[in-house]
From Swiss-Prot:
Domain (NR LBD): residue spans on this chain: 565-813
Zinc finger (NR C4-type): 458-478, 495-514
Protein name, entry field: Ecdysone-induced protein 75B, isoform B
Compositionally biased residues, Gly residues: 15-25
Subcellular location: Nucleus
Inducing factors: The expression of this protein is developmentally regulated and is correlated with the 20-OH-ecdysone induced activity of puff 75B.
Keywords: Developmental protein, DNA-binding, Metal-binding, Nucleus, Receptor, Transcription, Transcription regulation, Zinc, Zinc-finger
């Protein structure tokens, strides 16, 4: 009884992985035999065994004992040295391949058959097993064959596609009698199968009970070693082990018994298998579906044709065997050894032959799938007898080598154990699910199959196809015709009937020209010849396709009658609508009445309305739950439309995906109440239109939706009309990707006819009503597209923001102690930062602008009563919901590479900024520093930098202050600082030069810009103007607050600044559309995030943090702790002085100033609200792309700037200068006072001491902190000597000469530098063509000479006059070329010597004081 115990062990080990049918049974459970790869030896052994068995048939058990190697769990690894069949990992260096024989224990589940008699040992050899079964009474034989616990040995080799698998056939259960009869034939190996198209296959031999059950090549891709795509032809490289010769009458009785038992019950459904793991591979499923659906089981004739598809061959041996076992069990009762001899032969072949056949057998039992090795492919159909005859004839003609029973699919590899093992063990039910588990519709891969009932038809003439020939299913006649035509290269006489003869079975010989033409047209090709059997999975596909076509024909007939019956169709659609829609007239009228009588207003953040793309975090779940039900209603409604269920899964998905929101809008349109200008949310609350958040381009969307709703509601559609209109919106034949267009068009036309009927009935006096209604469909689609985009953007942003929050918490904790920033400040920063990544960023600057935390509520907590532009009012909530606000504002934590990775220390950070300027200036970006008073700057930043085209900045400041307390962790990046560059939001930021950049900005209220123009840019423009006004007001009310107005760089005419931006986007429809498209993610920040854990970045951040800490400690009251603390502030130069109110107002009035300039000049991190949007701008700012020369120059300038800034800062308040530039401390008020004298031209005076450490360019983002610290200390010392220089130095950033900002920074302030003992080099640049639009594209033309000269002059001056200061004035007269005069001047000569241009001058004078 060892065998029984072994079998039990196998069962336990197999678990529920499925019972593998075996030819041993409980009474004769067999032990595993590993089949030697040398099959010749195996034949000899088996011969001997067979003789022994014949001598003592009854004692087969004991015989098997002698052969038994090990119980089931044993795994034998045998290495066969064979010429390398394929250069895969299995091939050893010596050219041999390791063939691993493993019992398939995973998939083996012992079927506990109570009827099993004594425990028969696992019989090793086929002969033993067969002999045992032969000698055993039929019952025993059945048990033998049904034993599921027999272990399998799977030999898997990866073979080249064109390698013949020369194998000597060991007797296989299917060919045993043949083995006896024709040993000589068996000794010769059958002609190898050439799988020439398959490049990598795994040759799998499944040995169960010592018999080679299956020898098949499976696509390697399906297996663990899979390398190549699935073959286009049969996977099994060779037929099951022994060539199956036409077994007309001589099959041994035991063979018959076994196969009878296996497959006789023609339609008996297999008993449910032991709990199978995941569903089995599709081939089984489809066949089984085919059988289980009541179609007669595939019979031999039915089996004739199999479509060869390139799907992976999933091995399903176990399930097939299991099914076979079950069938055998059922069959046991009606079996007699020789009765069903013929059927058995066929069935046997089928059952052992292919996974598809076996699955079909499993399901239907009696389908015989004879698969010939020649291209004749058998597919199962119900015409058994005909096919049997055909096959037998072919078999006899083909002879033994040509035909062999397709093997059961090789068992799945362990990799797929979960799914395929279940398939192996699973019964037909599981099989049914299996093909679907692969996710492919059976018919989808066989679009060209034509069926007549269950018969595949020839694609050329419509006759009964005999197989898959030359790439298509064709009959023998057309196959031969095509073969003759191509082999003999026959040139047929051209057709005399216009070459349009219809080729039918009855007339196919009349016109050979047209017949050949049609052969080629349907896809016949000499190259499509396949060798070997049709892959089993394809066979299964064909069966499924047949079955489906049969079903579909019946269903379509029923559907045709239903669609043609208009009243019935009307009733069905109306019923579906009423059952699935919660917003019928009655229900909604009650809700509207209640809303008017006692409105319960919903705050936008808590909005539960389909149009709100961004419900606040806590309400998002509730919103989703409430709204999911509505969406489900639409899906259910679609499913109830007659004919929808007949569509393929792909078509259903396509229609629903494209039309879901359209139908949803039609249903929800009644929730918009234009009388009270509000929307009734799904939770019954009312939300006013002006309260809906304007973020994420939502204002444009909301306005459009309200307009559309008003238009639709004015039509007063009835429920029947709404239901039919929803159906038409869903079932639209013009959706791309539809397959069954014919049916969809038919449904559409019928539904449209129903709608026309209803409309004519309800509105006899409005004949044009239907046309008017259908005209709304394009608008409806546009709305749903916009809405979907916003939702997608919101989701992405949301995830991004959450992620940012999570990792910002660590940093935030660090920075918390140092920064007592007000929460709003940090929050604004967060938004700012968020803007960089926000996909919305460039899309909907409008909304972001609206969302900008411009709401006074957020700004005033600072106590600054700043008039916020009207646009910002609606978004007051945004700041209160920082996360939401950040999300909607299109912000994304702007962790610029410069800030995060590369700004390890202040030196690096500033190098980043200035260096990137050098890079940017070449690309036409302008960096306009505005010098501000420190206090002003901080306050203004708290107020937010309004003029950033996103008023977000305005609120950014205040919001920053509040929110920094709330979200200090966010603040860490965000406030990182003033250095955060914001990409320009202007239309130019897309890299597209519209040519319409005008200097006038129409003042437009936030609500007014909801035309189809790019909401974002138009609002930006409006915001710029309004921001300018607001800044001006702020400056007036709070002279201490100087607002840095940074607007997209447009021609800066200070006088026209308020009118600058409005028209820009309005005139560019294409640009509007471009800007509405969701932008790409900010790749820099994404990379940053990816590399954040990297130790290099950690170290840099750590260093940053330390410097920031030191700076914070040294910072004085003059500089806000805001500017001092954040480690991320490092990129910001020490002192960015805010210009005096006059300067600020000029700047504010000048929307033309680049936002970039604002970022650069903005000293306190609070201002970092305006984070960059466009990936293009960001990439332009990415410093690593600078050339070494640029880096060197930027380094020099940066060091100078740092030193000078720190000097300026320290001059006013001791210790400020000591702060490393990373602290981005704003210069003391005195500096600002000096700066108040600056004219419209921005002047950068950098005074650095001789001992400035390194001019050598620090590698990107990693300038040594020591250099920065030394520079700061040196600058502090120099600053102490030179208090007034602070104003001059306050402008840290190198102003790109073509910065168009006309900030009123009077060069007079440069006199501050006069005190410093260090020699100064003053570079004054007048930019003539300040009106030139900013072009961010990397291929932008080089800056005009005036700007170029400024850059070059600055850099060259530094290099040329290392010890000497010079006034280099590059003045670009508006008309003429710039005159650059470099005159060495004593350092004492005040820079003021360069007369400050009047603020009104259009030429911006950039004065760069470079210390030698």
């Amino acid at each position: 009884m060892e065998a029984v115990q072994a079998a039990a062990a196998a069962t336990s080990s197999g678990g529920s992985s499925g019972s593998v049918p075996g030819s041993g049974s409980g009474s004769a459970s067999k032990l595993i035999k590993t089949e030697p790869i040398d099959f010749e030896m195996l034949h000899l052994e088996e011969n001997e065994r067979q003789q022994d068995i014949e001598r003592e048939p009854s004692s087969s058990n004991s015989n098997s004992n002698s052969n038994s190697l090990t119980p089931q769990r044993y795994t034998h690894v045998q290495v066969q040295t064979v010429p390398p069949r394929q250069p895969t990992g299995l091939t050893t260096p010596g050219g041999t391949q390791k063939v691993i024989l493993t019992p398939r224990v995973e998939y083996v589940q012992q079927r506990a058959t109570s009827s099993t008699g004594g425990g028969m040992k696992h019989v090793y050899s086929q002969q033993q097993g067969t002999a045992a079964s032969r000698s055993a009474p039929p019952e025993t034989t059945a048990l033998l064959t049904t034993t599921s616990g027999t272990p399998q040995i799977i030999i898997t080799r990866t073979l080249p596609s064109n390698q013949h698998l020369s194998r000597r056939h060991s007797a296989s259960p299917s060919a045993l009698h043949h083995y006896q009869q024709q040993q000589p034939q068996r000794q010769q190996s059958p002609p190898p199968l050439h799988h020439q198209q398959q490049q990598q296959q795994q040759h799998v031999r499944v040995i169960r009970d010592g018999r080679l059950y299956d020898e098949a090549t499976v696509v390697v891709a399906a297996r663990r070693h899979s390398v190549s795509p699935p073959p286009l032809h049969h996977h099994s490289r060779s037929a099951p082990v022994s060539p199956v010769i036409a077994r007309r009458g001589g099959a041994a009785a035991y063979m018959d018994q076994q196969y009878q038992q296996r497959q006789t019950p023609p339609l008996a459904p297999p008993p449910p298998p032991p709990p199978p793991p995941p569903p089995p591979p599709p081939p089984q499923q489809q066949q089984q579906q085919y059988i289980s659906t009541g179609v007669p089981p595939p019979t031999a004739a039915a089996r004739k044709f199999v479509v060869s598809t390139s799907t992976r061959h999933v091995n399903v041996i176990a399930s097939n065997h299991f099914q076979q076992q079950q069938q055998q069990h059922q069959a046991q009762q009606h079996q007699q050894q020789h009765q069903q001899h013929q059927q058995h032969q066929q069935h046997v072949i089928a059952s052992v032959s292919s996974s598809s056949s076996s699955s079909a057998i499993g399901s239907g039992g009696s389908s015989s799938s004879h698969i010939f090795r020649t291209p004749v492919v058998s597919s199962s159909s119900s015409s058994n007898m005909h096919h049997q005859q055909q096959q037998q004839q072919q078999q006899s003609s083909l002879g033994n080598s040509v035909m062999r029973p397709p093997p059961p699919p090789p068992p799945p590899k362990v990799k797929h154990a979960s799914s395929s093992s279940s398939g192996n063990s699973s019964s037909s039910n599981t099989n049914n699910s299996s093909s679907s588990s692969n996710g492919e519709e059976p018919s989808s891969s066989i679009p060209d199959l034509e069926f007549d009932g269950t018969t595949v038809l020839c694609r050329v003439c419509g006759d009964k196809a005999s197989g898959f020939h030359y790439g298509v299913h064709s009959c023998e006649g057309c196959k031969g015709f095509f073969r003759r035509s191509i082999q003999q290269k026959i040139q047929y006489r051209p057709c005399t009937k216009n070459q349009q003869c219809s080729i039918l079975r009855i007339n196919r010989n009349r016109c050979q020209y047209c017949r050949l033409k049609k052969c080629i047209a349907v896809g016949m090709s000499r190259d499509a010849v396949r060798f070997g059997r049709v892959p089993k999975r394809e066979k299964a596909r064909i069966l499924a396709a047949m079955q489906q076509s049969t079903q579909n024909r019946g269903q379509q007939r029923a559907l045709a009658t239903e669609l043609d019956d208009q009243p019935r169709l009307l009733a069905a659609v109306l019923r579906a609508h009423l059952e699935t829609c919660e917003f019928t007239k009655e229900k909604v009228s009650a809700m509207r009445q209640r809303a008017r009588d006692c409105p319960s207003y919903s705050m936008p953040t808590l909005l539960a309305c389909p149009l709100n793309p961004a419900p606040e975090l806590q309400s998002e779940q509730e919103f989703s739950q409430r709204f999911a039900h509505v969406i489900r209603g639409v899906i259910d409604f679609a499913g109830m439309i007659p004919g929808f269920q007949l569509l393929t899964q792909d078509d259903k998905f396509t229609l629903l995906k494209a039309g879901l929101f359209d139908a949803l809008f039609v249903r929800l349109i009644c929730m918009f109440d234009s009388s009270i200008n509000s929307i009734i949310c799904l939770n019954g609350q009312v939300m006013r239109r002006d309260a809906i958040q304007n973020g994420a381009n939502a204002r444009f969307l909301v306005d459009s939706t309200f307009n559309f709703a008003e238009r639709m509601n004015s039509m007063n559609l009835t429920d029947a009309e709404i239901g039919l209109f929803c159906a038409i919106v869903l079932i639209t034949p013009d959706r791309p990707g539809l397959r069954n267009l014919e049916l969809i068009e038919k449904m559409y036309s019928r539904l449209k006819g129903c709608l026309q009927y209803i409309v004519a009935q309800n509105r006899p006096d409005q004949p044009e009503f239907l046309a008017k209604l259908l005209e709304t469909m394009p608008d409806l689609r546009t709305l749903s597209t916009l809405h979907t985009e916003k939702l997608v953007v919101f989701r992405t942003e949301h995830k991004e923001l959450l992620r940012q929050q999570m990792w910002s918490m660590e940093d935030g904790n660090n920075s918390d102690g140092q920064q007592n920033k007000s929460p709003s400040g940090s929050w604004a920063d967060a938004m700012d930062v968020e803007a960089a990544k926000s996909p919305l960023g460039s899309v909907s600057s409008t909304e972001s602008a609206d969302l900008d935390y411009g709401s006074p509520s957020s700004s005033q907590p600072q106590g600054v009563s700043l008039p916020s532009p009207p646009q910002q009012q609606p978004s007051a909530l945004a700041s209160s919901a920082p996360l939401l606000a950040a999300t909607l504002s299109g912000g994304c934590p702007l962790r610029n590479r410069a800030n995060s990775g590369s700004s390890g220390d202040s030196g690096a950070a500033e190098m980043d900024i200035v260096g990137s300027h050098a890079h940017l200036t070449q690309n036409g970006l302008t960096i306009t520093p505005i010098v501000r008073h420190q206090q002003q700057q901080q306050q203004q930043q708290q107020i937010g930098i309004l003029n950033n085209a996103h008023s977000r900045n305005l609120n950014g400041g205040h919001a920053m202050c509040q929110q920094q307390q709330q979200h200090p962790q966010l603040h860490h990046h965000l406030t990182a600082g003033a250095a955060r560059y914001r990409k320009l939001d202007s239309p130019t930021d897309s890299g597209i030069e519209s040519g319409n950049e005008k200097n006038e900005c129409k003042a437009v209220s936030s609500g007014g810009s909801s035309s189809c123009s790019s909401p974002r840019s138009s609002v930006d423009d409006a915001l710029d103007c309004s921001d300018a006004a607001a800044n001006h007001n702020q400056v007036v009310q709070h002279p201490q607050l100087s607002v840095v107005s940074v607007s997209p760089v447009r021609s800066p005419q200070p006088s026209t600044s308020s009118h600058l931006k409005r028209q820009i986007v309005e005139d560019m429809p294409v640009l509007k559309r471009v800007l509405q498209a969701p932008p790409l993610y900010d790749t820099n920040s994404l990379m940053d995030e990816a590399y954040k854990p990297h130790k290099k970045f950690r170290a840099l951040r750590h260093r940053e943090f330390e410097t920031a800490e030191a700076d914070a400690s040294s910072s004085t009251s003059g500089s806000n702790s805001l500017s001092a603390g954040s480690p991320r502030q490092s990129p910001v130069p020490n002192s960015v002085a805010t210009p005096p109110p006059s300067a600020a107002s000029a700047a504010a009035g000048n929307p033309a100033q680049s936002q970039l300039h604002m970022h650069l000049t903005r000293s306190s991190p609070k201002a970092s609200m305006a984070s960059s949007h466009s990936v293009l701008a960001k990439s332009l700012m990415a410093e690593p792309r600078m050339t070494p020369e640029q880096m060197k120059r930027s380094d020099i300038i940066q060091n100078y700037l740092k030193r000078e800034n720190s000097t300026a800062a320290s001059s006013t308040t001791n210790g400020v200068g000591n702060r490393s530039p990373s602290s981005s401390s704003t210069p003391p008020p005195s500096a600002v006072q000096n700066q108040q004298r600056w004219g419209s031209s921005s002047v950068i005076t950098t005074t650095c001491q001789q001992r400035q450490q390194s001019v050598s360019p620090h590698s990107n983002g990693s300038s040594s902190s020591s250099s920065s610290s030394s520079s700061s200390s040196s600058s502090s010392s120099s600053t102490s000597s030179n208090c007034s220089s602070s104003s001059a130095s306050s402008c840290q950033y190198f102003q790109s000469p073509h910065s168009t900002s006309n900030g009123t920074s009077a060069p007079a302030s440069s006199s501050s530098g006069s005190n410093s003992a260090t020699p100064l080099l003053e570079l004054q640049v007048d930019i003539a063509d300040s009106a030139q639009p900013l072009n961010l594209s990397k291929k932008s033309p080089t800056p005009p000479p005036s700007k170029l000269h400024a850059l070059v002059a600055a850099a060259n001056a530094v290099q040329r006059y290392p010890t000497l200061s010079a006034d280099v004035t590059v003045t670009a007269s508006n008309g003429g070329p710039p005159s650059a005069a470099a005159s060495p001047a004593p350092s004492s000569s005040p820079p003021a010597s360069v007369g400050s241009p009047n603020p009104g001058l259009s030429a911006a004078v950039h004065k760069v004081m470079l210390e030698a």
